[in-house]
Swiss-Prot record:
SUPFAM superfamilies per the UniProt record, alphabetical: 2Fe-2S ferredoxin-like (SSF54292), Ferredoxin reductase-like, C-terminal NADP-linked domain (SSF52343), Riboflavin synthase domain-like (SSF63380)
Leader peptide range in chain numbering: none
Record-annotated FAD-binding FR-type domain positions: 136-286
A GO molecular-function annotation: electron transfer activity
Protein keywords: 2Fe-2S, Cell inner membrane, Cell membrane, FAD, Flavoprotein, Ion transport, Iron, Iron-sulfur, Membrane, Metal-binding, NAD, Sodium, Sodium transport, Translocase, Transmembrane, Transmembrane helix, Transport, Ubiquinone
Cofactor names: [2Fe-2S] cluster; FAD
Keyword Transmembrane helix: yes
Function: NQR complex catalyzes the reduction of ubiquinone-1 to ubiquinol by two successive reactions, coupled with the transport of Na(+) ions from the cytoplasm to the periplasm. The first step is catalyzed by NqrF, which accepts electrons from NADH and reduces ubiquinone-1 to ubisemiquinone by a one-electron transfer pathway.
UniProt remark on cofactor binding: Binds 1 [2Fe-2S] cluster.
PROSITE patterns: 2FE2S_FER_2, FAD_FR
Residues involved in [2Fe-2S] cluster binding: C76, C82, C85, C117
Protein name: Na(+)-translocating NADH-quinone reductase subunit F
GO biological process: sodium ion transport
Organismal lineage: Bacteria, Pseudomonadati, Chlamydiota, Chlamydiia, Chlamydiales
């Protein structure tokens, strides 16, 4: 009886605890409705009455502008890490937040510069926004395919209206607008080859419900570099990595949500409609005679492919081009066959593949695990295989894109060799 009594007590206590949680949540929601009054606010833009937008208070400036048809670029998805959603609040600027203070100079803060993803709309405001953002457009596209090209990376291929081409440049990016949705990660197997199942099963990533059905309209968007180049229109491509929660004891932490936009992308199937906006970007090609070195890792493959295919197939560039691409194993390598074909076709293009964790089957197939220019972290392989052998590393132009640790390692390495920061084009979404 003692054991049953204890179990009964635990069950009752658990029910009471859950009930208290539900009541508190209800009180918070009711309080917000009663005490936080939503009211209309006017956003006057560039001192032009015709551009004035009326929005509801309480949202961030980024979301308010997006819902009004002005998609301010926010590659990091509103996390205040990319620092690109800058606007100037000319009138009625609130006190800057710490994220603003770490982004802008004292003079810029006094002039009203703020990160729109952090700035709340509570009253009428006058804004100054760059014309290029006001001229950004949106397009509806149809998903052609959405297959995995690596364990955690999809190649999203979308067809847009050929009569309304997207005027993007290689190295540019578009923002994907995320509607409300609910998905189960097991359904993503429909667009995933079975060879990738084992890792997903090992990390318990299947049968995970991602519920963003209450997502406010037009409240979420994230930027992704284009993997395609302009000559491939009306088809556009992206390489997009799933943002999983951090792992605890080999399983995803249920307390941390999955990436809102990447989960939406992974749920897409051929025939689905999506909306993109832009184009944006700063990491374009510098058209001079300097030889080019691309240092790319993971889903940075988008950025590298767009530039390299445009240089070779569209511009017929004679510049020396080296691509160093880093992946864990051959299963994770992206566009290998395409780059090998380009290398055979163009004598000025050189493709270097580096694996950090080659699989036994890679080694059995002939991969040299003992060559430090092939089996290594990319920055070390690049240093051994090319950088240390250059007479004047500062005379090259470097294009860098990959995970944060990849980017920081490359920047430090190039800095150690005296390469000026102006000679490094970094595509960094603050992930």
């Amino acid at each position: 009886m003692t054991w049953l009594s204890g179990l009964y007590f635990i069950c009752i206590a658990s029910l009471i605890f859950c009930a208290i949680g539900v009541i508190l949540a209800g009180v918070i929601l009711l309080s917000r409705k009663l005490f936080i009054k939503v009211h209309p606010c006017k956003l006057k833009i560039n001192d032009n009455e015709e551009l004035t937008k009326t929005v509801e208070s309480g949202q961030t400036l980024l979301v308010s502008l997006l819902s009004s048809g002005i998609p301010i670029p926010s590659p990091c998805g509103g996390k205040a890490t990319c620092k690109q959603c800058k606007v100037r609040v000319v009138k009625n600027a609130d006190e800057p937040l710490e994220t603003d203070r770490s982004t802008f100079s004292k003079r810029q803060l006094e002039e009203g510069w703020r990160l729109s993803c952090q700035c709340k709309v509570q009253h009428d405001m006058s804004l100054e926004i760059e014309e290029r953002y006001l001229n950004a457009s949106s397009w509806e596209g149809t998903v052609i395919s959405n297959d995995n090209v690596a364990t955690f990376i999809k190649e999203l291929v979308v067809a847009v209206d050929p009569n309304k081409p997207i005027p993007f440049k290689p190295g540019g990016y578009l923002q994907i607008t995320v509607p409300s949705y609910k998905t189960n990660s097991s359904d993503w197997k429909q667009t995933m080859a079975p060879e990738y199942y084992s890792d997903w099963e090992h990390f318990h990533l299947f049968d995970q419900v991602i519920d963003n059905s209450q997502l406010p309209a037009d409240s979420a968007n994230k930027a992704y570099s284009l993997a395609s180049y302009p000559a491939e229109l009306p088809t556009i491509k992206f390489n997009i990595r799933i943002a999983t929660p951090p792992f605890i004891n080999g399983k995803p932490n249920s307390e941390i949500p999955w990436g809102v936009c990447s989960s939406y992308v992974f749920s897409l199937k051929p025939g689905d409609k999506i909306t993109v906006s832009g184009p944006y970007g700063e990491s374009f090609m510098k058209d001079d005679d300097r030889p080019l070195i691309f240092l790319i890792g993971g889903a940075g493959s988008s950025f590298g492919r767009s530039h390299i295919l445009d240089l070779l197939l569209n511009k017929h560039s004679k510049r020396e081009i080296d691509l160093w691409y880093g992946a864990r194993s051959l299963k994770e390598n992206i566009y290998q066959e395409e780059y090998e074909n380009l290398e055979r076709q163009f004598p000025n293009f050189h493709y270097h593949l580096v694996l950090s964790e080659p699989l036994p089957e890679d080694i059995a197939a002939g991969w040299d695990k003992d060559d430090p220019t092939k089996t290594n972290f990319l920055f070390r392989a690049f240093n051994l295989g090319q950088l240390s052998r250059l007479d004047n590393p500062e005379d090259y132009l470097y294009y860098v894109c990959g995970p944060p640790l990849h980017n920081s390692s490359i920047l430090k390495l190039l800095g150690d060799y005296g390469v000026e920061r102006s000679s490094i084009i970094l595509d960094d979404f603050g992930s």
